[in-house]
Amino acid sequence: MARQEQTMNDQLKVRREKMDELREEGIDPFGHRFERTDLAQDLQDKYGDMDKDELDAKQVVATIAGRMLAKRGKGKVGFADIWDRSGKMQLYIRKDVVGEDTYHIFKRSDIGDFLGITGQVFKTDFGELTIKVTGLTFLSKALRPLPDKFHGLQNVEQIYRQRYLDLISNRDSFDRFLKRTKIISAIRHHLDDQGFTEVETPMLHNQAGGAAARPFVTHHNALNIDLYLRIALELHLKRLIVGGMEKVYEIGRVFRNEGMDREHNPEFTMMETYVAYFDFHDVMAETEGIFKAAAQAVTDDGIVTYHDQKVDFNQPFKQIHMVDAIKEKTGIDFWQPMSIEDAQKLADEHHVKYEPYWKVGHIINAFFEEFVEDTLNEPTFVYGHPVEISPLAKKNEEDPRFTDRFELFILGNEYANAFSELNDPIDQRQRFEAQAAERTAGNDEAEHIDEDFVEALEYGMPPTGGLGIGIDRLVMLMTDADSIRDVLLFPTMRPEEDK
């Protein structure tokens, strides 16, 4: 460790000496605006398939800029790799072409430095597209050495804490975040084409609601009140439906003061949509369209590979009622009316854990999670959730024990949650009161009564279909990422000094 620290200190010293040397030669080591004509990938697209002689005849001159991530050669000839946001371009530089002063700058440049390059585009004898340098502008000095170019960052914690180094050294990671942007853009484009209006609603709430989760609490000094970082987008978006907006969506951060694991981060990105006059069947079709658009944004054929398992988003999604799914796997028929004692007995017999305050619907959901959820590999809509676990969903007309709600499962994970929204203010108040009773009985994630939201419903909300999708989990699926931290540029981390 001491030897590594000494090596690092030596490199820091040498790089600062080179910085001073540049200044002595009248060169600003942290340069100025530089105008480039092309990105590396643009040149590859234009000339990558062109014959060597044909390219030479065209006498193509290009100006690029980027970070030098490789350097080789001796004497009066050198090669380097310049990376910009689009990819890599090889440089070929000769002292007799650029002159002694410019070649000296190149020779004294370090891996990590930013260079502006002008030169002729050609192909080497090995067929690699290359720029023969005629002009070099020093743009920025890297005072610290980059991670090893062959191995990148090996410390997982460092990857998340110093994402900028991960992006420099790991092109797969860089590309994953570009895909994230493409996915979100594709979803927005799809919804905009469907006539949705994108809106922004408050992140600071007077009362946490819209989901069963613990909130973060903050304090507003001027008003002298506690406020809650939002745990969901739902209740404000429904207020907009009441106001007549009819077809709205929001993509934004939500915050939950809960545990962290490979699928959960305290702040994450949610998308919710609400459409007047839709029911949950309409929302199923909407959801399929969103997932197909996301898959097409990052694949050529709409088929995504996640951990060596292929998911074909071109095929229609399956649909099954939660009770039927449980019956298929266990033989237990929860369609039959039963008391809480009967349900608890079944749970005991099948080693399904439950809480004392649970009702039959809670136990049905526990059976689903225990025996069914992990088996759902193909995209599958599971609908008909019990009313006890769906306080904001409309009851099913034929069997009011269940709701017009679905969740989308793929490869055993849940990716979307949707309802025919509850628009009866009297029923909504009763659901909130049942949640309040659960909170009193020990469920500290149960919702409070939101009087303002109930009042909004009393002005009248049309039948509405609502949808929620966790964007980060969706991006994990579409980019074959192991952890939510791999799709968040800057995931939540414990401060290093607290270790």
Curated annotation (Swiss-Prot):
Keywords: Aminoacyl-tRNA synthetase, ATP-binding, Cytoplasm, Ligase, Magnesium, Metal-binding, Nucleotide-binding, Protein biosynthesis
Gene Ontology MF annotations: ATP binding; catalytic activity, acting on a protein; lysine-tRNA ligase activity; magnesium ion binding; transferase activity; tRNA binding
Primary location recorded for the protein, binned into one broad class: cytoplasm
Entry annotated with the keyword Nucleotide-binding: yes
SUPFAM superfamilies: Class II aaRS and biotin synthetases (SSF55681), Nucleic acid-binding proteins (SSF50249)
PANTHER family registered for this protein in UniProt: LYSINE--TRNA LIGASE, CHLOROPLASTIC_MITOCHONDRIAL, LYSYL-TRNA SYNTHETASE
Gene Ontology CC: cytosol
Cofactor note: Binds 3 Mg(2+) ions per subunit.
Localization (cell): Cytoplasm
Keyword Ligase: yes
Protein name, entry field: Lysine--tRNA ligase
EC category: ligase
Cofactor(s) essential for the protein: Mg(2+)
Enzyme Commission number(s) of this protein: 6.1.1.6
GO BP terms in the entry: lysyl-tRNA aminoacylation
Subunit structure: Homodimer.
Catalytic reaction annotation: tRNA(Lys) + L-lysine + ATP = L-lysyl-tRNA(Lys) + AMP + diphosphate
Positions that bind Mg(2+) 2: 414
Family: Belongs to the class-II aminoacyl-tRNA synthetase family.
HAMAP family attached to this UniProt entry: Lys_tRNA_synth_class2 (MF_00252)
Residues given in the record as Mg(2+) 1 binding sites: 407, 414
